[in-house]
Amino acid sequence: MSDDTKKQDTAADAEVEKEMEGVPEHLRDDRGSEEDASDDLSAALESLKSDLEAAKQETLYAKAETQNVRRRMEKDIQDARTYAATGFARDILSIADNLARAIDAIPQELREDEKFKGLVAGIEATQRELDKVFAQHGVSRIAAMGLPLDPNQHQAMMEVPTDEVEPGTIVQEMQAGYMIRDRLLRPSMVGVAKKPD
C-alpha cells in the first residue's frame, strides 16, 4: 500500500471519527464484523418468516370465515324461500277451520235436498282446493286422534277421564294443528286421556 493511500484512509477515518463525535455509544454502529451483520440478518429473516406465517394463518382464517358467512347466507335465503308463506298460511288457517266447521254443521237432510246439493258440493270443493293449495306449499295437518301426546306438536287443553285408552293418548281434537314442511305452524289443541278417579 502506498503512503498516499494510507494517508487517505487515515484522513477518512479521522473524518468519520469527527462526524461521530457527539453520537451516543448505543447508536454507533461499531459492529464491524460480518458475523454480527449475518446474525442480525438471520434474526430479521426469521422475524419476517414468522410474520409471513402469521399473515398466511390470518388469511386462511379470513377465507374460512368468508366461506362460513356465505353458507349461512345461502341457508338463510333458502329458508326464506321455503318458509316465506308461513305468516300467510298461519292467517289462513282460521279460514280453513271455519270452512271445516261449516261443512260439519250441514245436516244430512240438507245434503240430500236438491236445492242445497250444489251449495254443499261447492263448499266441499272449496275445502278440497284449500287442502290442495296447502299441500303445494308444504302445509300439512298434524295427526292427533288416538296418538300419544307429543308436546312438540300437540297442546293439551284438558284431560278426559277414561279407561278405554292408555293415559296420555289423545281422545279429542278441538282444533287441528298444522306443520309447514318440518316446522310447526300451529299445534293441535287436544284432550288427553287420564285414568278415572
From Swiss-Prot:
One of its GO terms (molecular function) is unfolded protein binding. It comes from the Bacteria. Its main location: cytoplasm. PANTHER family: GRPE PROTEIN, GRPE PROTEIN HOMOLOG, MITOCHONDRIAL. Participates actively in the response to hyperosmotic and heat shock by preventing the aggregation of stress-denatured proteins, in association with DnaK and GrpE. It is the nucleotide exchange factor for DnaK and may function as a thermosensor. Unfolded proteins bind initially to DnaJ; upon interaction with the DnaJ-bound protein, DnaK hydrolyzes its bound ATP, resulting in the formation of a stable complex. GrpE releases ADP from DnaK; ATP binding to DnaK triggers the release of the substrate protein, thus completing the reaction cycle. Homodimer. This is Protein GrpE. It comes from Erythrobacter litoralis (strain HTCC2594). The lineage of its organism: Bacteria, Pseudomonadati, Pseudomonadota, Alphaproteobacteria, Sphingomonadales. The gene is grpE.
